C-alpha cells in the first residue's frame, strides 16, 4: 500500500474517532448537566423527595409548598410549587456551573479536532510541495514535453 493511501485511511479513521468522541462528550456533558441540576435541586437545602412522597406534606416556609393532602405513598396531582429566593439562586448557580462545564468539555474536543485536522492539512500540503508524484496523481492526464 502506498504511504499516501495509508495516511488517507489514517486521517479518515482519526476523523471518525474524533467525531465519535465529540458526540460521546456531548452526550456525557448533557447527562452531567441534567444530573447536576437534579442534584442541586435535591441537595440538603431542598426537601428530601422520598420523604416528600411518603409524607406528602411540606411547610410553606420551605422551598416547596404542597396542597394539603392526607398521608399517602403517592403524591396527588393537585399540588402546586413555589420556589423560594434561596433555591432559585442555588439553581441559577448550579445552572451556570453546568453550562460552563458543558462549554469547556465541548471546546476541548473541538480544539483537539481542529488541531489534528490542521496537522493533517499541513502534512498533505508539505507532501505536495516536496513530492512531485502527488502532483501527478492530482492531474488526470500526464504532462508530456513535445520537442
UniProtKB/Swiss-Prot annotation:
Name of the protein: Putative uncharacterized membrane protein YGR290W
Lineage: Eukaryota, Fungi, Dikarya, Ascomycota, Saccharomycotina
Localization: Membrane
Disulfide cross-links: none
One GO term describing the cellular component: membrane
Further details from the record: Partially overlaps MAL11.
Regions that span the bilayer: 17-37, 106-126
Membrane topology: Multi-pass membrane protein
Organism encoding this protein: Saccharomyces cerevisiae (strain ATCC 204508 / S288c)
Chief location: membrane
Position of the signal peptide: none
Extracellular side: 1-16, 127-147
Keywords recorded for this protein, A-Z: Membrane, Transmembrane, Transmembrane helix
Cytoplasmic compartment residues: 38-105
Amino acid at each position: 500500500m502506498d504511504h499516501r493511501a495509508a495516511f488517507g485511511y489514517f486521517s479518515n479513521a482519526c476523523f471518525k474517532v474524533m467525531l465519535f468522541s465529540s458526540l460521546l462528550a456531548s452526550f456525557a456533558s448533557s447527562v452531567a448537566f441534567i444530573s447536576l441540576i437534579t442534584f442541586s435541586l435535591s441537595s440538603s437545602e431542598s426537601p428530601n423527595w422520598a420523604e416528600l412522597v411518603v409524607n406528602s406534606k411540606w411547610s410553606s416556609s420551605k422551598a416547596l409548598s404542597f396542597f394539603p393532602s392526607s398521608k399517602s405513598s403517592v403524591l396527588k396531582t393537585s399540588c402546586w410549587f413555589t420556589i423560594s429566593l434561596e433555591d432559585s439562586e442555588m439553581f441559577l448557580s448550579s445552572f451556570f456551573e453546568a453550562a460552563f462545564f458543558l462549554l469547556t468539555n465541548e471546546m476541548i474536543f473541538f480544539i483537539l479536532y481542529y488541531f489534528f485536522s490542521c496537522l493533517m492539512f499541513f502534512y498533505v500540503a508539505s507532501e505536495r510541495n516536496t513530492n512531485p508524484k502527488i502532483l501527478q496523481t492530482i492531474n488526470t492526464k500526464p504532462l508530456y514535453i513535445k520537442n
